[in-house]
């Protein structure tokens, strides 16, 4: 990550010392925290949301000022419909999570973070207005669909820039949201075996140039950067590749490219 110089970083279950070391290395980066849980139940959503905020606070409070904001559950909404996903319960969980995390602990919450393209843009103001307006940030997962080999293919562009349709739907409905963060970005199949390192880097840079056009977007957290022995996500891993260097060079502050 030393070569990457990212503007947005997502840390999953960081130790306090590791998170502090990341902040020291990247003082201007926006850092999002996430606590992994294998089960994400939504029964009794209000108390569960508040309890999950309490659980996260044990790490988040010592990291106040180090990690900017924290997510709750991850990719709760999949590729089905509102009734299958229990949107009402997911909304209530997020509201309770944000109210407890922000109101009790003074730590910003990130709403959303649903599966890529899982929720119809118009359904966000319809089903999730309270969660979005309560939380200080809104997270989107942006992945080019399976079988697409570049963000810049037509179907890739539509998926990667889908956050604009979500933002437009919220605006039309009068739902206020905090800044957007693309908390995960990539190809659905992973870039390895799909692209060269140079082509993958070009895609991430292209997306950054698009995000820069929208002042309501903080930036993107690329999925992902993992240890070499991580087999589960090896097709997504950018560690030790030219992608780090090429994107890092793009992210470097110069007179021609202000940071």
PLM ranges: what are they?
Residues 14, 20-119, 136, 196-198:
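Substrate-binding cleft of extracellular glycoside hydrolase catalytic domains
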Residues 46-57, 87-97, 120-125, 156-166, ...:
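Well-ordered, non-membrane alpha-helical segments in soluble/globular domains
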Residues 95-103, 160-217:
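Catalytic-core region of carbohydrate-active enzymes that cleave or remodel glycosidic bonds
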